[in-house]
A protein has these predicted regions:
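ATP/NTP-dependent adenylation/nucleotidyl-transfer catalytic domains that generate, transfer
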Residues: 250-253, 275, 296-297
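Alpha-helix boundary/capping detector
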Residues: 123, 127, 281-282, 292-293
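Residue-level detector of flexible, active-site-proximal loop/helix-junction positions
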Residues: 62, 273, 295
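Conserved short alpha-helical segments that host acidic/polar catalytic motifs at enzyme active sites
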Residues: 1-198, 203-264, 269
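Short, glycine/charge-rich flexible loops or terminal/linker lids adjacent to PRPP-binding catalytic cores
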Residues: 285-299
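Structured, non-catalytic alpha/beta "coupling" segments that mediate domain-domain communication
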Residues: 198-201, 205, 275-289
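Short alpha-helical
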Residues: 92, 274-275
Length: 299
C-alpha cells in the first residue's frame, strides 16, 4: 500500500487518472483507470498488486487525451521481459521521434509521449535494460522524471536540467521511496534522503539494501519549472532543499517591496496563492482576508 498512500498524498498533482504497477514473482501487474486514487483502487487491488517494488502515477494531462489508454503506468512485454514506465514531463521532440518509430514499424496505442520511450527501449539492440534506457534517453529532448520497473529492478532518471522535481526517501523498514514531492514521505513515515540530481540515474535492485547512482548526463544550469514553487507543489513539500510554503511567502514579501499599493485587504486566490498573500500582507501591513472561498469538490 506504500505506492497507494504516496499517490494519495500527491493527488493534487493530477486528478484525471491513477495507476500502479507492481513486480512480484517475476511478473508485473498493473491497475489503472480514470478517476481519483480512492476511486481507482480498493482492497481487491491490493491483493493483485503485491510485491517488493512498485511504481505509480497520477495523471495531469499535458500531452495526449483523457482516455484510459493515456493513463500511466505504461506496460509492455518485449524481448528482455516486461517493463512498466511512469513519466512526469514533456518531450519537445516527441513528434519527430514518433514519426521515425512508425516508419520503422512501431504501433502506438496512445497519444502519450511516454510511449515513445517504451518503443525506443524495446527497439534497442543493447544486451541489458540499463543500456537500452540510456540509448533511448540519448534520443529524447525535454523535461522528464522517469521510473522504469522491470521484474527485478527499478530505474529512476531525472533530465539534465532538473525541470521536474524528484526526491528519494527512506522507509522505516529500510526500503526506499521515490516521489515528485516529499509530502509523499510524510504519509508513509519515510525520511528524506536527497534529491535525484539532474542527469542522474538511480538503480534499485530487489534484495539489495543500497542503490546505485550513475551520472548519465552532465548537469546543465538548473531549470526547475517555476510553476512547481508557485502552483503545482503542496506547501509542505521540500523541492531542491527549499520549503515550498516559505518560498511562496517570500515571493509575497518581495512583491510587496517592489509593488506596494494602498488597499483595504490582501485577498488570496486559494489555495496556492494563500502563502504569497500572507507574505504580502505581513510586509505591507495590510490586513489579510479570505474573501474568496474555494469549493474543493466542484471543478
Amino acid at each position: 500500500k506504500t505506492a497507494y498512500y504516496g499517490l494519495f498524498s500527491m493527488q493534487h498533482r493530477g486528478q484525471e487518472a491513477s495507476g500502479i504497477s507492481a513486480s512480484y514473482n517475476h511478473q508485473i501487474k498493473t491497475i489503472k483507470n480514470r478517476g481519483l486514487v480512492t476511486e481507482v483502487f480498493d482492497n481487491d487491488s491490493f491483493e493483485i498488486l503485491q510485491g517488493q517494488m512498485a511504481i505509480g502515477h497520477n495523471r495531469y494531462s499535458t500531452a495526449g487525451s483523457d482516455s484510459v489508454l493515456d493513463a500511466q503506468p505504461v506496460s509492455a512485454k518485449y524481448s528482455l521481459g516486461e517493463i512498466s514506465i511512469v513519466h512526469n514531463g514533456n518531450l519537445i521532440n516527441k513528434h519527430e521521434v514518433r514519426e521515425r518509430l512508425i516508419e520503422d514499424g512501431a504501433i502506438f496505442q496512445s497519444n502519450m509521449d511516454t510511449e515513445n520511450i517504451l518503443h525506443l527501449i524495446a527497439k534497442s539492440k543493447k544486451e541489458n535494460l540499463q543500456d537500452r534506457i540510456i540509448e533511448a534517453l540519448e534520443q529524447i529532448v525535454g523535461a522528464y522524471c522517469l521510473l522504469i520497473l522491470s521484474r527485478s529492478k527499478m530505474f529512476v532518471v531525472r533530465d539534465p536540467y532538473g525541470i521536474r522535481p524528484l526526491s528519494i526517501g527512506r522507509l522505516k523498514d529500510g526500503g526506499y521511496i521515490v516521489a515528485s514531492e516529499t509530502c509523499a514521505f510524510d504519509l508513509v513515515g519515510a525520511t528524506y534522503v536527497r534529491d535525484v540530481a539532474p542527469g542522474e540515474m538511480i538503480v534499485f535492485e530487489e534484495g539489495k539494501s543500497a542503490f546505485k547512482s550513475i551520472e548519465l548526463f552532465e548537469a546543465k544550469d538548473p531549470r526547475l519549472c517555476a510553476f512547481e514553487y508557485i502552483y503545482f507543489a503542496r506547501p509542505d513539500s521540500m523541492i531542491d532543499g527549499k520549503n515550498v510554503y516559505q518560498i511562496r511567502k517570500k515571493l509575497g514579501e518581495i512583491l510587496a517591496d517592489k509593488s506596494s499599493c494602498k488597499a483595504d485587504f490582501v485577498v488570496p486566490v486559494p489555495d496556492s496563492g494563500v502563502p504569497a498573500a500572507l507574505g504580502y500582507a505581513a510586509r505591507s501591513n495590510i490586513p489579510f482576508e479570505m474573501a474568496i472561498v474555494r469549493n474543493h469538490y466542484v471543478g
